[in-house]
Amino acid sequence: MSTRAPAIAVLALVAATCAGCAMFGHGDEAYRLSEELGELPGVQGSDVSYVDPRLFESADIRLHVRMRDDATPEQVAAVFVAAYDALTDVHLGEEGTLYVRLRDDRLRLRTFESDAKPSDVEEAALVAAAVAEQQYRTTVDVIARDVDDPPRVRSAVTERVPKGTSAAGVEQARADIEEAYGDLPVTVDIKVALR
């Protein structure tokens, strides 16, 4: 008895399944989401890059938002919540990253099959925007993927302080950031600029 026929049937089934998966990209929705984010208060501009799903790889959506210089922490948080809502609904199962540029600071939201509450993402984004406003050049990651402990959101803050900042100044910056986050999960890294 030949094993060729069952092997061909299995390959045909896999090919049909994979072809079906490839048809379920959400590129149109990603572009609509970018337009919606661009219309939110405090937003100067918005762009998106979207990669359709491939065999054994999920789709990838990257949203880029530039905030106006006078944007408030509440406006930044509204962008995070709108993006998170879409990334955990229409784009569930897709790798999602939101990049927000706020003056000389960078804020980022990372998601993939996340189950954090939008209110927890909003709270982390509010603190991130407030910290960015108060500190020197800051990069804040709001991470809502692979976080097992409640609130299923954690933050990572990197601040680049000016060259010549003393050890006491570095520790004060760290303490200020940790105080701003209170009980929210956060890791803080302070780097002194070399130039």
Predicted regions and their residues:
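Short, non-transmembrane amphipathic alpha-helical segments
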Residues: 32-34, 74-93, 128, 162-187
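Short secondary-structure junctions
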Residues: 38-46, 91, 130-137
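Short edge beta-strands and adjacent turn/loop segments
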Residues: 42-64, 139-155
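Surface-exposed beta-loop interaction hotspot
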Residues: 97-141, 195
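Extracytoplasmic/periplasmic C-terminal soluble domains
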Residues: 136-195
